[in-house]
Structures are given as C-alpha cells and as structure tokens.
C-alpha cells in the first residue's frame, strides 16, 4: 500500500430526477473524467424540503428510472440512501452517511449551476462544505463572480473545495419533459430510451 498515493474520489449526484435526463448524465460523465472520479453515485432524493408544495413522483418510480438510465455505464451507480431515510432529505445527512460508507475516499458532490449558487442556504452549510468538494456544472450565462465573492468573504477556508467546469449546453429540463408528456409531445432523445419506455409503460406525468 502506497501511503503517499492520493485518496480515491467518489462523485455524488443528488437530485429529484423527476425524471433523470441526458443533461444529468452528461454532467456526471464529464465531471467523472475531469476530476478523476472512481465512480459517480446517483442518489434520488427521498422527501426533498425544497419541493414542498409541488407534486413529486413516487420515490420508487424515480429510483427505477435512474437505475435504468445508468445500468449501461460501469462507472455509474444508484443508491436508495435518501429514499430509505425518514423525514426530509438534507445534503448534510447524506454526506455524513457517505463518509461512513467510504471513509477512505474524498467526496465530490456534483450539482447544477443554480443549486451551486444556493449552497449558502443549505442546512448546516459549514458542515456541508467541510464534508465534500463541490462541482458546479456551469452553463452559458452563469456568472460565478457574486457567489465566489460571498464564499471568499464568509467561508474562505472552503474555497479550495469549490470547483466549476463547463458542460455542453443541453437545453433539457425535467420540468419541460413532464410538460411535454402531459401535452402528448415527443420526449425521445431528451432522455435514455429505457427511461422513456418506463414513463410510457407506467403512465407517469400524463395527469
């Protein structure tokens, strides 16, 4: 064992995934390559506090869609960690649990630019920042200046934990996919075919 070897890195992509689409998969794959991640674990939220008041598809359906979407990539896995947890799903709790499961690894939490910018509003933000590196998948028009200035001012010690990287512009959103299904519009090529077929078979998003 080489004690001087750098610690292994695991990527975590949390989200509602209602449904998961190619935008999520492209960001995860590019982050895996860019940051030399051993693998990326997708963790569908169980009871997301930021979605209170909005109808969210059952955790079982969302988990199954993610499972089908990642099954052909040996570097991707799906976990039901948050789904099995009672109460609201908070990132700080998930990161603590992941540290117990992977004590010898560094964690890299992958998120979109908008969520990246809202990290300061997350529960126990100081603990969150200390538990993981954060990778923000940037998009055209995203200006990180204000966010980075706030980070330098309030949490300068965590600046090395924050990373931004550019991903190809994919104008795909879960909200748009749900709307298209409800309106009877095609969603082929917006998400994996296995997920599209699951939506069709189960009748999700039609109401």
From Swiss-Prot:
Transmembrane segments: none annotated. Gene3D superfamilies: HUPs (3.40.50.620). Keywords: ATP-binding, NAD, Nucleotide-binding, Nucleotidyltransferase, Pyridine nucleotide biosynthesis, Transferase. GO terms for molecular function: ATP binding; nicotinate-nucleotide adenylyltransferase activity. InterPro entries: Cyt_trans-like, NadD/NMNAT, Rossmann-like_a/b/a_fold. It holds the Pfam family CTP_transf_like. Its EC number is 2.7.7.18. The keyword Transferase applies. The keyword RNA-binding does not apply. One of its GO terms (biological process) is NAD biosynthetic process. It catalyses: nicotinate beta-D-ribonucleotide + ATP + H(+) = deamido-NAD(+) + diphosphate. NCBIfam families: cyt_tran_rel, nicotinate (nicotinamide) nucleotide adenylyltransferase, PRK00071.1-3. Catalyzes the reversible adenylation of nicotinate mononucleotide (NaMN) to nicotinic acid adenine dinucleotide (NaAD). Belongs to the NadD family. This is Probable nicotinate-nucleotide adenylyltransferase. The lineage of its organism: Bacteria, Bacillati, Bacillota, Clostridia, Eubacteriales.
């Amino acid at each position: 064992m080489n004690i001087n070897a750098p610690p292994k890195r695991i990527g975590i992509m949390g989200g509602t995934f209602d449904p998961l689409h190619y935008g999520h998969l492209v960001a995860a794959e590019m982050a895996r390559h860019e940051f030399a991640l051993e693998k990326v674990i997708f963790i569908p939220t169980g009871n997301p506090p930021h979605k209170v008041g909005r109808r969210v598809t059952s955790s079982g359906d969302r988990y199954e869609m993610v499972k089908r979407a990642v099954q052909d990539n040996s570097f991707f896995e799906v976990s039901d960690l948050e789904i099995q947890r009672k109460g609201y799903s908070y990132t700080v709790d998930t990161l603590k649990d992941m540290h117990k499961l992977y004590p010898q690894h560094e964690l890299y939490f992958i998120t979109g630019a908008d969520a990246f910018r809202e990290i300061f509003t997350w529960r126990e933000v100081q603990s969150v920042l200390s538990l993981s590196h954060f990778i923000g998948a940037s998009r055209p028009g995203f200006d990180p200046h204000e966010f980075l200035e706030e980070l330098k001012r309030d949490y300068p010690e965590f600046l090395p934990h924050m990373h931004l990287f550019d991903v190809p512009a994919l104008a795909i959103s879960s909200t748009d996919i749900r709307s298209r299904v409800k309106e009877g519009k095609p969603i082929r090529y917006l998400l994996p075919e296995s997920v599209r077929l699951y939506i069709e078979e189960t009748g999700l998003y039609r109401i």
